From Swiss-Prot:
Composition skew (Basic residues), residue ranges: 101-122
MF terms (GO), sorted A to Z: rRNA binding; structural constituent of ribosome; tRNA binding
Region (Disordered): 97-122
Official protein name in the record: Small ribosomal subunit protein uS13
Amino acid sequence: MARIVGVEIPNDKKVEIALTYIYGIGKTRAKQICEATNIDPNKRVRELGDEEISKIATFIQQNYKVEGELRTEVMQNIKRLIDIGCYRGLRHKLGLPVRGQKTKSNARTRKGPRPSRIKKKK
């Protein structure tokens, strides 16, 4: 398994798909990385040489925020919304949907499991 930006990339996958295992890189960005580094996206990871792997790794580090750096930025953005007390920040704080979805009957993922209603027997 190749290691790029601290993430183990599976050997049996194509480069384009394998790069999506890195947090912050989707299919479109993976294609852009392959084009910029002149690597065939349909090539398997095990077929890549050390030089090509290091080429991909340096390109990603220089041009994109990925993994821990991206996660901390997202957390800081959410914390900033909470600190300034805006509506979106309050929704994050309360653990409710942020983008205007209805919550009367849905939003179970965001709200968590239903509170149990166990009645006492007399």
